[in-house]
Amino acid sequence: MCLTKDLNLLGSYETGFDMEKSIYNILTIDRWGSLNHMDYRQARLRLVHGKLALKFLKWVVKQPGLETDHIVQLVCITTHILVRARMYDPARHILKELSLMSGKSSFVFGALMTTYRLCNSNPSVYDILIRVYLREGMIQDSLEIFRLMGLYGFNPSVYTCNAILGSVVKSGEDVSVWSFLKEMLKRKICPDVATFNILINVLCAEGSFEKSSYLMQKMEKSGYAPTIVTYNTVLHWYCKKGRFKAAIELLDHMKSKGVDADVCTYNMLIHDLCRSNRIAKGYLLLRDMRKRMIHPNEVTYNTLINGFSNEGKVLIASQLLNEMLSFGLSPNHVTFNALIDGHISEGNFKEALKMFYMMEAKGLTPSEVSYGVLLDGLCKNAEFDLARGFYMRMKRNGVCVGRITYTGMIDGLCKNGFLDEAVVLLNEMSKDGIDPDIVTYSALINGFCKVGRFKTAKEIVCRIYRVGLSPNGIIYSTLIYNCCRMGCLKEAIRIYEAMILEGHTRDHFTFNVLVTSLCKAGKVAEAEEFMRCMTSDGILPNTVSFDCLINGYGNSGEGLKAFSVFDEMTKVGHHPTFFTYGSLLKGLCKGGHLREAEKFLKSLHAVPAAVDTVMYNTLLTAMCKSGNLAKAVSLFGEMVQRSILPDSYTYTSLISGLCRKGKTVIAILFAKEAEARGNVLPNKVMYTCFVDGMFKAGQWKAGIYFREQMDNLGHTPDIVTTNAMIDGYSRMGKIEKTNDLLPEMGNQNGGPNLTTYNILLHGYSKRKDVSTSFLLYRSIILNGILPDKLTCHSLVLGICESNMLEIGLKILKAFICRGVEVDRYTFNMLISKCCANGEINWAFDLVKVMTSLGISLDKDTCDAMVSVLNRNHRFQESRMVLHEMSKQGISPESRKYIGLINGLCRVGDIKTAFVVKEEMIAHKICPPNVAESAMVRALAKCGKADEATLLLRFMLKMKLVPTIASFTTLMHLCCKNGNVIEALELRVVMSNCGLKLDLVSYNVLITGLCAKGDMALAFELYEEMKGDGFLANATTYKALIRGLLARETAFSGADIILKDLLARGFITSMSLSQDSHRNLKMAMEKLKALQSNKKD
């Protein structure tokens, strides 16, 4: 301190030593006021002076009335004193307080600068200030001090500059290291080796290894020899960037430069190699250390032991432990924990426990980590008895059981189904004052979801909210996945929406799970729309996403849509997998596009490894199901030619196809031949096919034989086999034989299943055994089996067959109320029955129910309703049904429209009939000439000859060719009205239209002529008919005989008729007499008898 004040009152002190002694005495007794009366002079400061300055500062700041500026000045003076007295730590502390008190770095610098010359200080005070700022992470402030120092002609030391450089690099501040270096050189601050080390580290971190090598060369040329730190820095980055060859070359370069690698160098290299899963090379470096006489330490061995343990090579890790012990090195917790974890991962609990006890024998107390590793491994491998023992041991030894250990145990218990014990452990965890985290709760939720206890999982989610946590993305994904797995798709979507609202990031796993579930539920269009929405939200579908959607369309048989998605998939750059191709082929096969499927399979042979046994099996199975066995056998041969070996499924598919076609004997021979060649072994599925085929063929004894053969070969018949037998008995009408099969089903996967009951229900329903059907339905409910649409159909079928239609409707309503799916076939059956019984209103009510359930009308339903409505003269309702069919894209049969036109004409509503005719033409139900002809016939049938004739002429004028039936009907009306000549004129018109008479037309004209007594012309037509290749029927002969018998005079035609009747076998020669009239009467009786028998 350089204060020069003279006070006359203390002039008696003659020497400097006496003055110093007096000041010291006054200061030590805290009589600060006496200092104002003393005379000062310049002297070198020592440690004691710094201490006194601090003591004085503490006294001053406690004095009242001091202004901030005075305090700052005193603090700065004290800092200068401390720096000159080399008391750097107190100086740092004061500067830290001053920087916090003042805020701005420029203010602190200015305050120090103001007192700098007063105290004859030195620049190191600013070095300390810079380091204070760096230690507090205030890099910008340190750079500001560096700048201000330059303005006043001061330079910090190179060590301070290195500290700034190092801090800038670590912090990642937006400050250029190279700009700072340039400023250093500009201010002639000479860099040292440490400076170069920092710069080399920066270049290596950026991957600029060439520049770092150049800098090292520049460093050497400038007289700075790279140290071990320099080389270690470069080696570290070589290893981190995977340039291990360059690292080894640098090691050799170090040796050539006389810089020996130390144990830290090798430890760093080994650590980086192990982290990059190159543990074998790390072990070679250990051997290299030995050769270079560098002794590995505990860190070296721990790194390698941990690396080998993580890689599953615990035996090598154990050998390294023995080597470590042989060199006198002491393994620590890290060593044993790695070995315990390694042995546990391999499932070798005996060795893991040996390591644990060895650790204790070495005097090392197992830590929470040691126990945690052991407990986690034991729980994962379901060794819960051992785990419980070590858990209690931790408690006894006072080792704190932490959150990670508890979570590991809870996770292991949950994964192995010990959920209640997991909950108990959770409660113990809370009692120990350890709050479960989101990972702990996630393990519990996953465990409960896995076993289907979804309600409990949701309760745990509520508990998460109660403790102030929020479910993370993993928990949401777990809930969504398990909801989808259990078929609760609506709940899964609701959870997904909650996940979005919570702001969690959607991942591909959750996305693909939802897409797959939507496809499985048959909602493939919704799945595609969901994928579009995800794409618009920025989550692009991956290959799995596209595969899920293509598979969905494939399963539903929508091959074209599957290919559309495939095109989009390839367009965005995703490569199809063998699963993609399989789904596309499946889509074509299920959609019935077998020819296209065959072509697609052939094209896939050009794609490497795309065609395998599964692909061929897909197409072969589809061919078998479609009944195209020849093609299936051809595909089988093609497989063998292409060296694609058929598997058990291939043979089973072919055998099943043959059995379905009733070629069970061929299937058996094929199976025996394949078995003899060693291509396939007899299996349960194969014999089930034989049993099913034999029973369906009515060969129930042969079916029983194959059932017994299954037992002899050790293939226990399952419920599928028994169901095949029950179905066979039911089809043969021998359903009573199933009573012997039902008791033995108790041992087959829990007894009769829904398929069993449905088969029995259908069988008893066809027999109209309603009471047994209801007993079977009661058994379904009592056994906890959910009925399906087939159950409903079979039960309603029996009731309908028993003419209890009203009860059938009530049962249908009950099924719908219970949420059972009812199919279109059940509705069609009931609607047809309602229509047949004349209960049209009931039929319409059923149609309304169908519509409300989203089941559209089909052609069979509509046709049945139209027919009954027409019969009951409810023509307006009939038109409504026909219109509804058109709206739904169902093309009604033309005969339904024709029936409606006939009915309308019959009741005299000609105007509406013409409207319906126009609708037929407009909707393209049939060609215009057919529609117009139908109108002609309808008018003729209701006796409106003039209108019919007028319409016929209009048709001819419009160049529309009437049908033969319309001409025939009009000719029949003419003949009926006695206008045979007009009928014959119509025949001429027919001929002009290019139409020929058919058998009915000939019969109409012949009957009309006979009725008029014109037998000559009638027989002329008869001969013409025979010439056109038509064989006369009973109607023809009866008309001719009736005409002949009505004649009073003989006619030669009688002999012709009798001769033809005799030739055709209608009469015999034994029954003929000489009287033609009598013979004709006898022939008439014979013909009447024949027609009567035919009607019966």
Swiss-Prot record:
Family matches, as InterPro entries: Pentatricopeptide_rpt, PPR-containing_protein, PROP1-like_PPR_dom, TPR-like_helical_dom_sf
PPR repeat coordinates: 122-156, 157-191, 192-226, 227-261, 262-296, 297-331, 332-366, 367-401, 402-436, 437-471, 472-506, 507-541, 542-576, 577-607, 612-646, 647-681, 683-717, 718-752, 753-787, 788-822, 823-857, 858-892, 893-927, 928-962, 963-997, 998-1032, 1033-1068
Coiled coil, from the record: none
Keyword Protein biosynthesis: no
Keywords for this protein: Repeat
Keyword check for Repeat: yes
Pfam families from the UniProt entry: PPR, PPR_1, PPR_2, PPR_long
Domain of life where this protein originates: Eukaryota
Signal peptide range: none
Record NCBIfam families: PPR
Family: Belongs to the PPR family. P subfamily.
Protein name: Pentatricopeptide repeat-containing protein At5g55840
